[in-house]
Amino acid sequence: MSFRAPNLIRSAAGRRASQTLNLRSQVIRRRFATEGGPEITKPSSPRSSNTRYLLAGVGIAAVGAAYYFYGTGRTAHDSANKADTVVRGAVATVEAKTGLRRGKDEYQKVYNRIAETLEKEGYDDGSLAPVLLRLAWHSSGTYNKEDGTGGSNFATMRFKPEAEHSANNGLHVAREHMEKIKQEFPWISYGDLWTLGGVCAVQESGGPTIPWRPGRIDGFEAQVTPDGRLPDASQAQDHLRFIFNRMGFNDQEIVALSGAHAMGRCHTNRSGFEGPWTFSPVTFSNQYFALLRDEPWQWKKWTGPAQYEDKNTKTLMMLPTDMALLKDKSFKKYVDIYADNEEKFFSDFAKAFSKLIELGVPERQWAGEPWTLGTSD
């Protein structure tokens, strides 16, 4: 379908759009600097084909911005935010098409810097890796395949409404830590930074190599997802399937991703639950599955929410959603596989986690196949 306007209207609209886009370009540049939007690094001698892509992308962004500003009946603030999102998406697409995006070596430097800062004396078990893994997981696990909302693309946990979702309690620790990394590498988007932090957390803690690639853009508060999209630890297997199927995961992937509980612990002042899942909560392994299956468990007698404790030491915990993996025949099949075969767990987790942290990102924003980034060893 084509759209045509009388000459007088086109002329007026053109002047108004030109004035607005000049103003918007100033705002957009400021927002790119302060909100982690992608930058274009100008090559010394760009190829003509790259230039054509760049000009086409800028033209598309301008048309989109003008349309959102004038054609949707939104408030000026909402329209401006939408225009910025259109431009950022166009920039990411142009970068992907032209090879203007920063290379693997630049992102390896960010990875290395994160790795250097993982150890933190006095925090939990001496490492920030578990909470960085949780940040990557929770910032991606809001995806809804039905309408394409949520996921890692807009890093909307930066905004108060999503930051205050009960499932995200305590993640201010991870966000504040990663903000320091962001100050050192202001060109990286928050979505790329947070997911890269999760990859680093797993790999530096003895886990598998996670395929990862850049391309996420930062959004606005209007793109915050509704509360309730992340798993509720007090629920059972039907809830797990509802949450994970909404993102596009099957039973095997549900169990594999649950293996992230190999790391970290719960806190009464965050989730209400208390304790670690394993005896080595800063090491990524298949110990979670072995303990879940082989240890005797009982209900913990305390005033907090219902959770399990191991009968032998009473120092470990499992959540109702963890125990659901044993009670459901389909889930338990994979618990047994992963408890007996760490290599298989690592392989399946790497695939599922890489899929998780790419949810919500349009294919056109990727520049190519995922990379594997080296560990600090």
Curated annotation (Swiss-Prot):
Catalytic activity: 2 Fe(II)-[cytochrome c] + H2O2 + 2 H(+) = 2 Fe(III)-[cytochrome c] + 2 H2O
Keyword Transmembrane appears in the UniProt entry: no
Residues marked Transition state stabilizer (site): R134
This protein's record includes keyword Heme: yes
Enzyme class, broadest EC rank: oxidoreductase
Cofactor(s) required for function per UniProt: heme b
Residues of the transit peptide: 1-17
Residues binding heme b: H261
Cofactor detail note: Binds 1 heme b (iron(II)-protoporphyrin IX) group per subunit.
Keyword tags: Heme, Iron, Metal-binding, Mitochondrion, Oxidoreductase, Peroxidase, Transit peptide
One GO term describing the cellular component: mitochondrial matrix
InterPro entries on file: Ccp1-like, Haem_peroxidase, Haem_peroxidase_sf, Peroxidase_I, Peroxidases_AS, Peroxidases_heam-ligand_BS
Gene3D superfamilies, per the entry: 1.10.520.10, Peroxidase, domain 2 (1.10.420.10)
Principal cellular location given in the protein's record: mitochondrion
Pfam family, one: peroxidase
A molecular-function term among this protein's GO annotations: metal ion binding
Alphabetical GO biological process terms: cellular response to oxidative stress; hydrogen peroxide catabolic process; response to reactive oxygen species
Coiled coil segments of this chain: none
Record-annotated active site: H138 (proton acceptor), W277 (tryptophan radical intermediate)
Job of this protein: Destroys radicals which are normally produced within the cells and which are toxic to biological systems.
PANTHER family hit by this protein: CYTOCHROME C PEROXIDASE, MITOCHONDRIAL (PTHR31356:SF58), THYLAKOID LUMENAL 29 KDA PROTEIN, CHLOROPLASTIC-RELATED (PTHR31356)
Oligomer and partners: Forms a one-to-one complex with cytochrome c.
Family named by the database record: Belongs to the peroxidase family. Cytochrome c peroxidase subfamily.
Protein name per UniProt: Cytochrome c peroxidase, mitochondrial
Annotated gene: CCP1
